[in-house]
């Protein structure tokens, strides 16, 4: 009869480590203390982003780098905006914008009587248009001395005044055709008087050497039709 040795272990011995240990055991992560039977080939692992930094300065970890809790008063506002963006997202916000348009070529404080459009057309100012309209109400045609005097007063050229009156007469005839006047005797007399005065002014303008463009020729034909 055999007796168990008093110093024999009560449990079965632990299994021997494998011949080819893997780097996933706890011993491999914490560092092996015992010797292995064969050479172990180290397996390259990618360190974490902060592992090298924290391993170099373990003694400089002070509470200043730790996150501080938000004040209770401010925490309620932080919960209202959970998706806050960092400042880096807006670092190049201005660069992404398209460049501004063309710079200002004129100052609004500079008084310019004339503004040219495309095609050589002239844009008259409000004061010039008002004075020209007043003159047109009393006189549809201008003699050369009157045109010269009006151009000098409005700081325009005679050609500009003449062109404005040509366009204004064309508009006046068009409106008159769209809205013909009544056949009353008084209105007919007034129309005849205005027509005769316009014809006289036109005759003076032709005698003084005014231009004979197509628009002015239409005015002459209209006057002949009225006098027939």
From Swiss-Prot:
Gene Ontology MF: a single term: RNA polymerase II cis-regulatory region sequence-specific DNA binding
Biased composition of type Basic and acidic residues is found at: 184-207
Question: Which parts pass through the membrane?
Answer: none
Name its cellular compartments.
Answer: Nucleus
PROSITE patterns per the UniProt record, alphabetical: HOMEOBOX_1 (PS00027), HOMEOBOX_2 (PS50071)
- Report the domain of life of the source organism: Eukaryota
Residue ranges of DNA binding: 117-176
Keyword flag Iron: no
- Which stretches does the entry tag as region Disordered? 175-228
Tell me, in one coarse class, where this protein mainly resides.
nucleus
Q: What induces it?
A: By dhama/boz downstream of canonical wnt-signaling.
Tissue expression per record: Expressed in embryonic endothelial and blood lineages. From late-blastula stage, expression is restricted to the dorsal marginal region of the extraembryonic yolk syncytial layer (YSL). By the onset of gastrulation, expressed in the entire dorsal half of the YSL. Post-gastrulation, expression appears in both anterior and posterior lateral plate mesoderm by the 3-somite stage. Posteriorly, expression is in the intermediate cell mass (ICM), which contains both endothelial and blood precursors.
- Which purpose does this protein serve, as stated in its record? Recognizes the DNA sequence 5'-ATTAA-3'. Transcriptional repressor. Regulates the differentiation of both endothelial and blood cells. Plays a role in embryonic dorsoventral patterning by regulating bmp expression. May establish anterior identity. Functions in the embryo to regulate liver development. Functions extraembryonically to generate organ chirality.
This protein's name: Hematopoietically-expressed homeobox protein hhex
Query: What is the originating organism of this protein?
Result: Danio rerio (Zebrafish)
Name of the encoding gene:
hhex
